[in-house]
């Protein structure tokens, strides 16, 4: 191909329309991103973006007059198309018109106002209410890796420094939506998760320290709990903030201060164990009611649903912290009426956390602000129900715990109030000022869109009331004018009408054309009628249409002020949302405990694990009309290995799983399905259940089994709970028995 001359290139550039030139400039700044370019009432896409969008969205691919490929979607319907592109794993940059086209001189000014990715979404209704949407950044290498996670929809910001071997487990705990890593790093990325690479310098801890301090207006990070050993996590946080700032140029005012998490505070549950125990996802895709989360989730708010999922995926290891939660659950179990009052009060609370985040970001619609108002107005009922529960005391035991010995710590104190409920009562902000402002300002049922009008309540603003009176009075004026003109002209069919093109007009049929007064000015000719205007009608039109335009502007100003008030109070709203989430989880766990006849476990730092008449919570609930046979399990410091034998379909795998599920429930702060439970804190939980191959990676059933078993043997410690089902069945009987024997011996002796 012959080289293109400079003159030819200049000529081609000169022939390119100014709008397309600007599109190219913006596109160059956002490579590997589909650009939604606002043109009037459409978002248009050009060149390769148009071709890709046409395939994914199944929309028409056309071209401009100059042959440039073109596809577009209406602005009003753009949200659904945008959601489809994000679900397909694409990034989309939204380039909006940032000035009124009527006032523009030349090309309308446009800017990218947001880049939407699977890990950075603020759009209404896109995310599952009961699940976080974390964008995660990883930094560092052996032996320590830093992790930073931000859920843009809720404002949560987490930091964690962990061993390189624990990265996959930590990512599984979060349930991330996308990941950011240095371009030269060999860090793990879960399958199906969008991966973004950044320059190594962006992960520098010193730069990150400055970035975090500047963003949250603090002089030092000491108050955040960031220590010298958290440099890797800090580096990840800096890169993550820088990346999100590019995606959200308008800012992230709802972003909370980072919370430092310590990996040794949580029970290690790897991906294999989460899958085998079906904690949050079923083994069979699409199966319903098969997970532990579905079994225990009786929450009534989206915030509570998300927190319950977090607790289930991150059980605790500190007996005192576990008892703190269990005390609250026990009070709610014992006070059934108080529990139901609390749940009824919470039932009308919407997703305050995400709605407030959208308000702070200037994205909340009138209907969403109305949902916040309705939620805030329920807070006094929540507070009253909480105060009654917090006043309840835990019962004083009449005898020592059956499994208690002098070498074991005592169970939590009784005859006292639950500290968790008292703390929640102290922290709950009724947000009375916001509730009052929103109740006075918003209509009872605000519309979905501000442009629809009818957002602000009458009597809230005198200027708006005057403009509305002028508009509403116009209806009477039109009726009066029509009657007067009929009498003056003697034309009984004369009528006053309006359309967006010609404005107000007087319409007269051709049969009465001879009676048209001389002061009527013809405006439009129809097949059977003529349309006219008069000086009086022109003057009225100018006044009314001007009033409607000013009314829309004023209503937008007032709504913006109400939304900004929520944004300014975002920290208070987020604190209250966190309290509501905890209350919802405690009440839900209590409700499930009562319905399932669960008992409070005694959680301690010994090595005993005793379960009397334990049941599998999921299976028991699924076979509600059948009798589930309970089973005992007992492990002590002296007897730490148990072999379960029996015929096929006798329930051996069920017993293994129910032991694991009872431990998870106990350490997350829930009652457990048993007659009695004593749980010595477990630091790591491993399971090897079932047989499967991994042909995509060239691994047979036996290879997968041995790889998983090897990982367990390398990572299990003195406080680990290991549940192995039929080790060695992927090979011959003789070899399988030898493998099972060797593995059992190793676990027993270590």
Model-derived regions: residue spans:
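Charged catalytic and DNA/RNA-contacting regions of genome-maintenance
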Residues: 2-334, 340, 344-360, 364-394, ...
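ATPase nucleotide-binding head domains, primarily ABC-like/P-loop NTPase cores
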Residues: 47-50, 300, 311, 509-541, ...
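Active-site phosphate-binding and catalytic loops of NTP-dependent enzymes
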Residues: 95, 118-127, 251, 479-491, ...
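Amphipathic alpha-helical coiled-coil segments and their boundaries
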Residues: 315, 335-338, 365, 453-456, ...
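Charged, surface-exposed helical/loop "interaction arms" that form contiguous linear patches used
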Residues: 361, 365, 378, 420-423, ...
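Intrinsic disorder/low-complexity segments
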Residues: 391-417
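Extended, charged coiled-coil "arm/hinge" scaffolds of SMC/Rad50-like chromosome-maintenance ATPases
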Residues: 443-447, 526, 530-564, 580
């Amino acid at each position: 191909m012959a080289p293109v001359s400079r003159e030819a290139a200049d000529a081609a550039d000169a022939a390119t329309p100014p709008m397309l030139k600007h599109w190219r400039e913006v596109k160059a700044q956002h490579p590997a991103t589909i650009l939604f370019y606002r043109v009037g009432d459409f978002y248009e896409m050009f060149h390769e973006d148009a071709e890709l969008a046409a395939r994914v969205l199944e929309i028409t691919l056309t071209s401009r007059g100059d042959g440039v490929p073109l596809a577009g979607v209406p602005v009003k319907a753009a949200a659904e198309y945008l959601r489809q592109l994000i679900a397909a794993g694409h990034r989309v940059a939204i380039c909006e018109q940032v000035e009124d086209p009527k006032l523009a001189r030349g090309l309308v000014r446009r800017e990218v106002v947001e880049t939407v990715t699977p890990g950075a979404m603020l759009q209404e209704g896109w995310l599952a209410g009961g699940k976080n949407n974390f964008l995660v950044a990883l930094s560092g290498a052996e032996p320590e890796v830093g992790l930073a996670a931000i859920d843009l929809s809720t404002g949560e910001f987490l930091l964690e420094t962990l061993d390189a071997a624990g990265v996959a487990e930590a990512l599984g705990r979060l349930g991330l939506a996308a990941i950011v890593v240095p371009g030269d790093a060999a860090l793990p990325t879960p399958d199906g998760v969008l991966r973004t690479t950044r320059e190594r310098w962006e992960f520098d801890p010193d730069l990150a320290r400055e970035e975090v301090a500047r963003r949250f207006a603090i002089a030092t990070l000491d108050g955040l709990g960031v220590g010298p050993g958290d440099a890797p996590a800090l580096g990840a946080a800096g890169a993550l903030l820088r990346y999100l700032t590019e995606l959200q140029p308008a800012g992230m005012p709802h972003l909370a201060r980072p919370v430092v998490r310590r990996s040794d505070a949580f029970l290690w549950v790897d991906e294999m164990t989460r899958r085998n125990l079906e904690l949050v996802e079923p083994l069979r895709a699409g199966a319903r009611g098969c997970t532990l989360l579905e079994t225990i989730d009786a929450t009534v708010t989206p915030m509570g649903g998300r927190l319950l999922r977090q607790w289930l995926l991150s059980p605790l290891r500190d007996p005192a912290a576990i008892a703190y939660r269990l005390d609250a659950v026990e009070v709610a179990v014992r006070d059934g009426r108080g529990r139901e009052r609390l749940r009824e009060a919470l039932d009308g609370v919407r997703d305050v956390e995400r709605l407030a985040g959208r308000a702070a970001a200037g994205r909340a619609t009138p209907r969403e602000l109305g949902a916040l108002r309705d939620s805030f107005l329920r807070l006094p009922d929540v507070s009253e129900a909480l105060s009654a529960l917090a006043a309840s005391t835990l019962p004083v035991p009449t005898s020592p715990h059956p499994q208690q010995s002098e070498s074991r710590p005592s169970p939590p104190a009784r005859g006292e109030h639950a500290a968790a409920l008292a703390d929640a009562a102290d922290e709950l902000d009724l947000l009375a000022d916001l509730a009052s402002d929103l109740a006075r300002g918003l209509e009872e049922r605000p519309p979905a869109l501000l442009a629809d009008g009818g957002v602000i309540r009458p009597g809230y603003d005198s200027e708006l009331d005057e403009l509305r009176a002028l508009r509403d009075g116009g209806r009477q004026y039109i009726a009066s004018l029509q009657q007067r003109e009929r009498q003056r002209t003697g034309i009984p069919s004369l009528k006053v009408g309006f359309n967006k093109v010609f404005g107000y007009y007087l319409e007269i049929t051709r049969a009465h054309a001879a009676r048209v007064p001389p002061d009527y000015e013809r405006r439009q000719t129809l097949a059977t009628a003529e349309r006219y205007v008069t000086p009086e009608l022109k003057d009225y039109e100018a006044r009314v249409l001007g009033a409607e335009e000013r009314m829309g502007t004023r209503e937008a100003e007032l709504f913006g002020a109400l939304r900004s008030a929520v944004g300014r109070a975002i920290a208070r709203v987020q604190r209250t949302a966190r309290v509501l989430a905890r209350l919802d989880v405690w009440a839900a766990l209590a409700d499930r405990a009562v319905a399932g006849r669960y008992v409070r476990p005694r959680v301690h730092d010994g090595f005993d694990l005793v379960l009397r008449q334990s049941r599998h919570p999921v299976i028991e609930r699924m076979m509600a009309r059948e009798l589930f046979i309970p089973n005992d399990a007992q492990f002590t410091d002296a007897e730490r290995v148990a072999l379960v034998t029996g015929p096929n379909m006798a329930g051996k795998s069920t017993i293994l799983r129910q032991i694991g599920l009872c431990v998870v429930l106990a350490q997350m702060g829930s009652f457990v399905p048993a007659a009695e439970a004593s749980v010595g804190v477990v630091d790591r939980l491993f399971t090897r259940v079932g047989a499967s191959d991994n042909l995509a990676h060239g691994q047979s059933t036996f290879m997968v089994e041995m790889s998983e078993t090897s990982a367990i043997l390398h990572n299990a410690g003195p406080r680990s709970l290991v549940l192995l089902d039929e080790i060695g069945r992927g090979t011959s009987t003789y070899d399988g028995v030898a493998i099972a024997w060797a593995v059992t011996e190793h676990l027993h002796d270590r």
